[in-house]
Amino acid sequence: MAAAPAVCASQGSPPGAPSAPAAAPAPAAGLGRCRMALLLAVALDVAGMAALLTGVFAQLQVRGRDFGDLLIYSGALLVFLSLLGWILWYTGNIEISRQELERDYGLRPSALARLARKLSRRWSAPAAAGQRPAPGSRRARRAARAPPPPAAGSRRVRLQLATLEAGPGAAGAGSE
């Protein structure tokens, strides 16, 4: 028995990825492509209805306190939360052709897209020490101003400069 994927699998490849020429999308099975979302929705519905009906029809009292209301409210909450699973399952099974997707949501240059791309590149830039920053970037300018790191095996010498005051009788300390 094969395990179902944890997330809904898309049928197309990402926009920048090369597509396989002979790979046709797999037809959706009877339950659709997002089986985990369907399983979540059904499980929450069953648990919610069981709690709700138990709270309505069972006389649950512990030490004189009635717990029917707690089960009714928690069951209603679980049934409401199952809507998220149903929405995920439904939206994961919507099929849109690549042509329709590009026609409706084609890449339009916008300031927001440029800003998102710039932030994404900056945040995902490799932080490894061996890789150099792009020339002209803020990181490259900062690296140019910073002193180079000390070489392996070198000693660090601290030099402190102080002002010297000439006392009476010192060379060059006469009045002119």
UniProtKB/Swiss-Prot annotation:
This protein's UniProt keywords: Membrane, Phosphoprotein, Transmembrane, Transmembrane helix
Report any Pfam family annotated for this entry: TMEM238
Q: Using the chain's own numbering, where are the disulfide bonds?
A: none
Bilayer-crossing residues are 37-57, 70-90
Q: Which residues lie on this side of the membrane: Extracellular?
A: 58-69
* Compositionally skewed regions (Low complexity) per UniProt: 9-22, 124-137
Its chief place of residence is membrane
Tell whether DNA-binding is among the UniProt keywords. no
Annotated Gene Ontology cellular components are: membrane
- Superkingdom: Eukaryota
Task: Tell me where in this chain the PTM Phosphoserine is found.
Answer: S175
Q: Which InterPro entries match?
A: TMEM238 (IPR029365)
Write down the membrane topology: Multi-pass membrane protein
Note down the stretches annotated as region Disordered.
1-22, 124-157
Q: Which residues lie on this side of the membrane: Cytoplasmic?
A: 1-36, 91-176
**Keyword hit for Membrane:** yes
Where, subcellularly, is it found?
Membrane
Q: What is this protein called?
A: Transmembrane protein 238
- Taxon lineage: Eukaryota, Metazoa, Chordata, Craniata, Vertebrata
